[in-house]
C-alpha cells in the first residue's frame, strides 16, 4: 500500500534534515536491522513499550520477508519485555530498548535495505500504537526513516 510519502513528509521532515538517527547510521549499512541498532543508540535506555513493539514487529517481518517466529525472534523478546515492563513500576528496573535490540544479530538472520514502503509501514505501526499519536524522536520509526534517507541520498525524492 503506497501513501505517497505523506507520512514521511509529516513525521520525517525534508531530506536535508538529517536527524540524530541518521547521524548514527553514517558509515553503516542502511538495512532494516541497522536502523533498529540506530534506534538502540539513540534511545536505548528507554523502557520498551507497546509502540516500540509494534515498530519492531514491522521491521522484523519486513527484514525476513514474511511471518515472524512466535518465540524465536526479536519481536518475541520485545513482547516479553513489554509484558514485564507493564508489571514493574520503576523505570530503572524495566527492560530497555537497547537490551531488546542487543540480540538482533542472533535473532534476525535475514535483512535488506530500507525502502520508502518500509519507512511508511514502520511509521504507521508506531503511530497506530502510540497513545499520543506521535512517533518517538530517535526511535524505531525515525531510525528506519533515516536509513531510507541515507539509502536515497543523493536522489531527487523530496520528502
Swiss-Prot record:
Main localization (coarse): cytoplasm
Family stated for the protein in its record: Belongs to the LEA type SMP family.
Family annotation (Pfam families): SMP
Domain spans labelled SMP: 30-87, 96-151
Protein name: Late embryogenesis abundant protein 50
Localization, UniProt: Cytoplasm; Nucleus
Keyword annotations of the record: Cytoplasm, Nucleus, Repeat
GO cellular component: cytosol; nucleus
Coiled coil segments of this chain: none
